Amino acid sequence: MANLRTNFLGVEIKNPVGVTSCDFGGNTRLAKRVIDKGIGWLVGKTVHKIDGPHRWPRPYFYSLKKFGPELRDSWTCSQMFHNMPYEQWLETEGPATLKLCRENDCLFIPSVSGIGTDPDTWIPFCKDMENMGCDMIELDTGGPHATFGAVAAHKDVGAPLAMDPDTAYKVTKACVDAVKIPIIFKMTPQCVNMAALALAVERAGAAGISANNAFYGTWIDHETASFYGGPFSCGGLMGRAWQLFSLAKVLEITATVKIPVIGIGGIFTWDDCVRYMMGGCHVTGLCSALYSRGVGVLKDVIDGISAFMDRKGYKSVDEFIGVCVPEFSYIRDWPKEEAPMKYPSPIIPVFDLEKCNNCGICEKLCPYGAVEIHKNKGPIINEHCMGCAWCQGHCPKDAVTMILKETGETIWNGRGLPSKWCK
């Protein structure tokens, strides 16, 4: 039986699956809904004193599902930080949520936001969390809304802080020096140089990093010739497809620094969690999936990881955390054939006719017009084949293998990495 217990910043947790900062960490009623599913950790809804308690522009969730099946899990969102006055939260929901989590073997991580780049506005929150008895604190510096504050003094609140290494260092260092519990810095995917930012907060003494917050986005309703939901950029690109971008950003961090990382962004399934952990994350968190698929997805994810570990023979999650990080590199470093590229391609697809059902998808989708379906011979490639593997990726029967034409050597079977056939 797989052991999902792991250690995160000195705290042993029952499994690496948690819920990131959202409604479900905002009060005990909602927190109980996800805690009851067996999560190992929970981040609170971000508390703050920016312009007083936030008033979310109701309605504030704008699902894009009606615009096509490709967008079934995507939405934009103008919900902001916690809408409860900070002092009220500090006296009621904060301590109550911490107590609820501890009673259920669930790590509670409060999330706080000061005002922009002024460290003095962050320190009081950190001291309050420490006095409350919290084990660690998340600095939510990566909010996707362009500007939270309504006045000029607040123009750098949110993502701008998490895009500048010098400013991030200054705020992180001040918070680290102010308390004795670990500080976690939350990143924004808007940051161009994640490695530089990660190095800055590690140097400042951050114990961990959360990556990534949501990106920003907007949508136009073509039927009404107007914006959909709101005429502004707000939290967007939520959904599983977002994972491709976020995971790449995460790897820029895990390949650069040694401090633990909370993996966030487009996680919907158990294998998404495994993917982030193999990419170097110590724990992984869900958010959007709870809204578009329901809180029951959490138990499915936890059970799925356990079953995967049993199937693969992993005894502990530590055995596969970071296994892909050493391989992460730049495309410029991948072996390539000598210029110019050979034509016709030395790499071609071969089709397993016992699996092929002549569906014609490869012929239809080949961008080079290089595949022709013959009734009795199956797919036949012509001289225009570029060896791109597009047909392989779209074959519903897994009937395509990429080979080196000259020798018949298998170059890629559609799983993992292709062979480095260029010497």
Segments (PLM) and residue ranges:
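C-terminal helical cap(s) of enzyme catalytic domains, especially alpha/beta-barrels
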Residues: 54-71, 218-235, 289-314, 415-420
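Short pre-active-site segment immediately N-terminal to redox-active cysteine/selenocysteine motifs
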Residues: 354-355, 365, 384, 394
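Iron-sulfur cluster-binding cysteine motifs and their immediate structural context
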Residues: 361-378, 390-407
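Short microdomains enriched in Cys/His and/or Lys/Arg
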Residues: 381-397, 410-423
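Hydrophobic faces of well-ordered beta-strands that scaffold small-molecule active sites
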Residues: 15-20, 42-44, 108-112, 137-139, ...
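N-terminal capping/small domains of soluble enzymes
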Residues: 1-108, 113-118, 124
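Alpha/beta enzyme core
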Residues: 36-37, 115-262, 268-275, 279-283, ...
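Extended, intrinsically disordered, low-complexity segments
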Residues: 65-69, 243, 303-353, 357, ...
